[in-house]
């Protein structure tokens, strides 16, 4: 039995779960999410909890058991409380602006980078250097945050770039520029 898959999913108050065959619909105060589960697993509602079970002991059923349990648990948590990812922008002159459903990033390129947010994902900017990505779908929030970070990932020499809040960037030492840097071995004489 899967360690993760066998754990029951508690259903909080104000959240309703509808199971129609392999389709699970979760409604809550933040919105509605729907997902079709693979046929290798089944989901059952038992009072105020959900149980994910697998149909047989095949390899695919065992692989998907814990995955489906986690996906459904994330749906329940998303419609109840939502998800948030925070990004920190570091660098001289680097800043962000939220314009409706767009995010405009000034991160050292010749032109500002404009990013359109997908449906169900909202973006807010604090102090022009902190970006908050939020929504009810954990996958969409994580993907959007990763795409924002991808615009200018943190570089190891000065640490400039976009990073997740709390992310530790391994720093490197730059070139040694002391003696011999001008006319040393192999250099111009």
UniProtKB/Swiss-Prot annotation:
PROSITE patterns: RIBOSOMAL_L6_1. Pfam families: Ribosomal_L6. SUPFAM superfamilies: Ribosomal protein L6 (SSF56053). InterPro entries: Ribosomal_uL6-like (IPR000702), Ribosomal_uL6-like_a/b-dom_sf (IPR036789), Ribosomal_uL6_a/b-dom (IPR020040), Ribosomal_uL6_bac-type (IPR019906), Ribosomal_uL6_CS (IPR002358). Keywords: Ribonucleoprotein, Ribosomal protein, RNA-binding, rRNA-binding. The keyword RNA-binding applies. GO terms for biological process: cytoplasmic translation. GO terms for molecular function: rRNA binding; structural constituent of ribosome. GO terms for cellular component: cytosolic large ribosomal subunit. Part of the 50S ribosomal subunit. PANTHER family: 60S/50S RIBOSOMAL PROTEIN L6/L9 (PTHR11655), LARGE RIBOSOMAL SUBUNIT PROTEIN UL6M (PTHR11655:SF14). This protein binds to the 23S rRNA, and is important in its secondary structure. It is located near the subunit interface in the base of the L7/L12 stalk, and near the tRNA binding site of the peptidyltransferase center. Belongs to the universal ribosomal protein uL6 family. This is Large ribosomal subunit protein uL6. It comes from Microcystis aeruginosa (strain NIES-843 / IAM M-2473). The gene is rplF.
């Amino acid at each position: 039995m899967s360690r993760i898959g066998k754990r029951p999913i508690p259903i909080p108050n104000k959240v309703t779960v509808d199971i129609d065959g392999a389709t699970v619909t979760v409604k809550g105060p933040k919105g509605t999410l729907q997902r079709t589960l693979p046929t290798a697993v089944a989901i059952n509602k038992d009072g105020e909890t959900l149980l994910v079970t697998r149909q047989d002991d095949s390899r695919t059923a065992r692989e998907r058991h814990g995955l489906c349990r986690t996906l459904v648990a994330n749906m329940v948590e998303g419609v109840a409380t939502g998800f948030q990812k925070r990004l920190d922008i570091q660098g001289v002159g680097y800043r962000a602006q939220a314009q409706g459903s767009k995010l405009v990033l000034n991160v050292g390129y010749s032109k500002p980078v404009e990013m359109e947010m997908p449906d169900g994902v909202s973006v807010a900017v604090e102090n022009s250097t902190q970006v908050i990505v939020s929504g009810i779908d954990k996958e969409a929030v994580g993907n959007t945050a990763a795409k924002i970070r991808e615009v200018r990932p943190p570089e190891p020499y000065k640490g400039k770039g976009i990073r997740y809040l709390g992310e530790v960037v391994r720093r490197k030492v730059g070139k040694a520029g002391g003696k011999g840097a001008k006319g040393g071995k192999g250099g111009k004489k």
